[in-house]
UniProtKB/Swiss-Prot annotation:
This is Small ribosomal subunit protein uS4. The keyword Metal-binding does not apply. The lineage of its organism: Bacteria, Pseudomonadati, Pseudomonadota, Gammaproteobacteria, Enterobacterales. Part of the 30S ribosomal subunit. Contacts protein S5. The interaction surface between S4 and S5 is involved in control of translational fidelity. Pfam families: Ribosomal_S4, S4. It comes from Pectobacterium atrosepticum (strain SCRI 1043 / ATCC BAA-672) (Erwinia carotovora subsp. atroseptica). The keyword Ribonucleoprotein applies. GO terms for cellular component: small ribosomal subunit.
Length: 206
């Protein structure tokens, strides 16, 4: 399955919630009817079955983190293999992706931009260049921007936006040095309450 390259707003409207796929503290302003389905007048949303609700939740989370279907299923398998709550494990694995950490630290305005920075070799982990977006960051790892990328206007713009967002407690960021420390794996309570991971577990448990 190819990565979606169409309008980001369309995806958010399809899920009925802001997926934060566009840059900005709130990517979708009040003029955009996010609860309205895609289309000129917004097609009426059919009442979903239990399976449909579970599928929509999976698609929502997959799109938030920019992960393809096969990757997402593999994350679920790994989450189920680990000790503890499978749903929480899944979200922690997704949060530990390098592209997500770069975004959370404020070095990219969106996860897509952060992913591009990683693939363009603009990001280092513990002083070494890492160009794999799915690389799992470990506690106490230092994530930084390469010297030649620090002057990019998009990085400065992203850091300015990040100042307006709530700062994750599991990260420590030095904006001046353009580096940060992944202090710990986030707890479920640290993450968005708008995600119902139990629906995803139910979907894959069938």
């Amino acid at each position: 399955m190819a990565r979606y390259l169409g309008p980001k707003l369309k995806l958010s409207r399809r899920e009925g919630t802001d997926l934060f796929l566009k840059s900005g503290v709130r990517a979708i302003d009040s003029k955009c009817k996010i609860e309205q389905a895609p289309g000129q007048h917004g097609a009426r949303k059919p009442r979903l079955s239990d399976y449909g609700v579970q599928l929509r939740e999976k698609q929502k989370v997959r799109r938030i983190y920019g992960v393809l279907e096969r990757q997402f299923r593999n994350y679920y398998k790994e989450a189920a293999r680990l000790k503890g709550n499978t749903g929480a494990n899944l979200l922690q694995l997704l949060e530990g992706r390098l592209d997500n950490v770069v975004y959370r630290m404020g070095f990219g305005a969106t996860r897509a931009e952060a992913r591009q920075m990683v693939s363009h070799k603009a990001i280092m982990v513990n002083g070494r260049v890492v160009s794999i977006a799915s690389y799992q960051v470990s506690p106490n790892d230092v994530v930084s921007i390469r010297e030649k990328a620090k002057k990019q206007s998009r990085v400065k713009a992203a850091l300015e936006l990040a100042e307006q967002r709530e700062k994750p407690t599991w990260l420590e960021v030095d904006a001046a040095k353009m580096e940060g420390v992944f202090k710990r794996i986030p707890e479920r309570t640290d993450l968005s309450a708008d995600i119902n991971e139990h629906l995803i577990v139910e979907l894959y448990s069938k």
